Amino acid sequence: DPKEKLWLQDKMEPIKNQPSLTAEEKKHILYKLIQAENFEKFVDKKYIGHKRFSLEGSETIIPVLDMLLSLAAAEKVDEVVLGMAHRGRLNVLANIIGKNMQEIFSEFEDISDVDSVEGSGDVKYHLGSSGVYETMYGDDINVSVASNPSHLEFVNPVVEGIVRAKQQMMNDSLKNKYIPVLLHGDAAIAGEGIVAETLNLSQLKGYSTGGTIHIIINNQIGFTTSPVDARSTVYASDVAKMVQAPIFHVNGDDPEATILVTKLAYEYRMMFHKDVVIDVYSFRRLGHNESDEPAFTQPVLYKAIRNHPTVKNIYQEKLLSEKVTDTSE
């Protein structure tokens, strides 16, 4: 669509894709990265060997979701509904949904509340939750993450159905009050047919939710499989080309760049009510789960990863060099 292309050009070319953030916004990004990293470190030390499918190596996803919710709250969106698999789910529940940490840790210890509603007995990284998120600007927004099975990407049409139902029940004819956000793994988005099926429904009158924001946690590995052995396309996001969705490839070690494309993706969705993709290139610091030793199957890759600093440390050093913050903070 020429109008969409012109709109994107007008947004990107004048600023040469260079982010412009205030000192407070930069500090807030660092704060969210610290939250994300500290959660993983604490769980790693406290519950050694427990499966948690950590977000380590891809922590920038937390500031991305924070920015999405901040933008949505500022425009009085009623609710953002998230769909995601196991990777980073506990981190999102803790730092985005606001699920009580005590509840999360009790699930590691297999402590259940006998007085609560009958539970599913499902594993902790499949459970959904809802909460109210307070943004850095002081706004509140409802946010929920749908429960999901082990079947990757199966949650996609479920989230779309949840959002569509809310839009219809609340007479949200403009589809601006309820927004679906789907997080994918790079191997899963390319490998699961349900992704293409759901994309195919995105512009149909009977199924459309006014555009979905897709975020790929692209850690460049699927369990033990390299991208070259996992898909026939160059990019994991190529499936989204079937609906001509804009795709933004961004370096997960550059939080400011990811925030820039997050703003762009959100604005595009609200302007054109179509799907849009943020492809965050990152890595997986640990194995597929915490009992897996990835160096057995990917020795060269994991030698490089073990020598690579965390995104929090990279960004912290950047802000120190810019004198945006100091060591006392």
Language-model-derived ranges and their functions:
Residues D1-V181, A187-I194, L199-T212, N218-V228, ...:
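Conserved internal helical-beta-strand scaffold that buttresses enzyme catalytic cores
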Residues D78, P246, D275:
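Residue-level detector of anion-binding/catalytic polar loops
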Residues M84, H184-G185, I216-N218, N251-G252, ...:
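Active-site proximal loops enriched in glycine and acidic residues that flank catalytic Cys/His/Asp
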Residues L204, V239, Y268:
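Hydrophobic/aromatic ligand-binding patch that stacks against planar heteroaromatic rings
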Residues A230-S237, Q298-A304:
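Acidic, Ser/Thr-rich peripheral helices and adjacent loops at domain boundaries
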Residues T233-H249:
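Conserved catalytic cysteine-centered active-site region
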Residues P255:
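ATP-dependent adenylate-handling ligase core
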Residues T258-E329:
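Active-site or pore-adjacent capping/gating segments
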